[in-house]
């Protein structure tokens, strides 16, 4: 089974949120990074603008642009939802027949990933496990704290403690 770690950025914590970007890293180091051009920017508050949108390639992030240009392991896509879906499925097809996704706080990220790939979990390709391994629950168990406390803890703090 191949593990693929991923994170998404989206327009807010609400029911009709739209995907802004997605990054994935396989357990062997292959990477995929995409920014979507057709997200609903009317859903973005000041926090999303400052902490997400302002750091995108689409916003002129030259530091990220340079980093990605020098990185031969990253597949980079900028496009609409259909473009990103096509390229992501092509990338995932290269991993064989059994993929397990891993994320921090899966209940946000996995829904958006499933919608991107297949318009929902029930339509995922057979080689993709529809269940996501949640790192937040691991943090909760390792530190013997509630999942709420694990959700609130800084990931940088967790890595250094």
Please tell me what each predicted stretch does.
Residues 3-7:
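Short, hydrophobic/glycine-enriched beta-strand segments
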Residues 2, 19, 26-70, 76-161:
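Metal-dependent phosphoesterase core characteristic of DEDDh/y 3'-5' exonuclease domains
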Residues 8-16, 22-23:
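Short acidic, Gly/Ser-rich segments with clustered Asp/Glu that frequently serve as metal-coordination loops
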